[in-house]
Swiss-Prot record:
This protein's record includes keyword Ligase: no
Pfam assignment, any one: Na_H_antiport_1
Gene designation per UniProt: nhaA
Superkingdom per UniProt: Bacteria
Catalytic reaction equation(s): Na(+)(in) + 2 H(+)(out) = Na(+)(out) + 2 H(+)(in)
Name the UniProt record assigns to this protein: Na(+)/H(+) antiporter NhaA
Protein family membership: Belongs to the NhaA Na(+)/H(+) (TC 2.A.33) antiporter family.
Transmembrane parts of this sequence: 23-43, 65-85, 102-122, 131-151, 160-180, 183-203, 211-231, 265-285, 303-323, 341-361, 373-393
Amino acid sequence: MARSFPPPSALRDFLESESAGGILLIFAAILAMIVANSPLATLYHDLIHAVTGPVLTDKLGPMTVHLWINDGLMAVFFLLVGLEIKREFVDGRLASWDRRRLPFIAAAAGMAVPAALYMFFVGDEPGLAQGWAIPAATDIAFAMGVLALLGRRAPTSLKLFLVTVAIVDDMGAVAIIALFYTAKINLLALGAAAAILGIMFACNRGGVKNLLVYMALFLLLWYAMLLSGVHATIAGVLAAMAIPFERTPGAPDSQTSPLHRLEHALHPTVAFAIVPLFGFANAGVDVRALGLDQLFAPLPLGIAAGLFLGKQIGIFGSVWLAVKLGIAGRLRGATWLQVYAVSMLCGIGFTMSLFIGSLAFPGNALLIEEAKIGILMGSLASALVGFAVLRLAPLHPEHNAVESASKGEIAVDGDVRDTSEAAR
């Protein structure tokens, strides 16, 4: 008999775990900064770079705690990202082109404008161009954590908008990692990965619903991708596409669907362990000897400007233009000022930005540290200003009525109806 799980809605579970996990991530990042700037700094760096073994590839050498987190545990994070993408596209908020239109427009502009701003600030500085994708990412957990601090003042339509934009943003980030941050390809290992993925899809087509089978194949796929030169975390997204899924339009999520079961099982681990661990292992930057010349160097300044200015300009500007041109409707129960504030919260890059930063400048500790400074500055500014604006923004006149309707939909069915005024 399939194991039952509460709650019935994957979307409600997602919103709750991302919010709570985001708050934990905030504390993990703050703790990392405190420790990295204290007498415990040496112990902190020795711990995260401690060799644990074994040697999985000649390129990586002996595995360290940091490598296990960034190349191992983050593959599980990307597996969950892939599951969320598949669920939303097949049976959720992105199941139709009408629903995809606004998040796609917002996410595309929200990646393009920050990247363009970054390139403007770094100019022709040698070796910095490959960091263009760092400010293009959004940390959904961190942003949802900030929204959670606002309680009922954050309209559900804004939370759902943030979720869908971030999911499309994640798709873009995955594509960027696969296309632009891939080392020399080992064709034999890549062929093995393709064969393993083919077996996973064959199991899906054959009606295999045992998650242990898929998880065993996922481990093999991860190792093959690690050997191939394509970043191993991509294995998570690819594996997610092969997990069987049962559509439940207009009804609660199926308790026998392998994808739903795996998503529910992974959410707590990813939100409360993997993402905070990643934040703690990657956010520790020693700023004790930091001068203004380092803060305003092209790399950190370009990243900070891309996250704080680029995201809000790209997302809010594209949403406003789409509504004015009749391409999409306004978000139900949300004012323009609230939409602007959430556009700022999308500038919290953190997890994905730190991850891309480590790929953009491999082996260059100085540039990676400068990238971290820019990510922390841009993310912190986006979080603080976005929170303040959303906290002070007047509520929409129909706030209470729209909230009651939205919560009823989420409680009964994860397939929430369109949250734009055009759908009314």
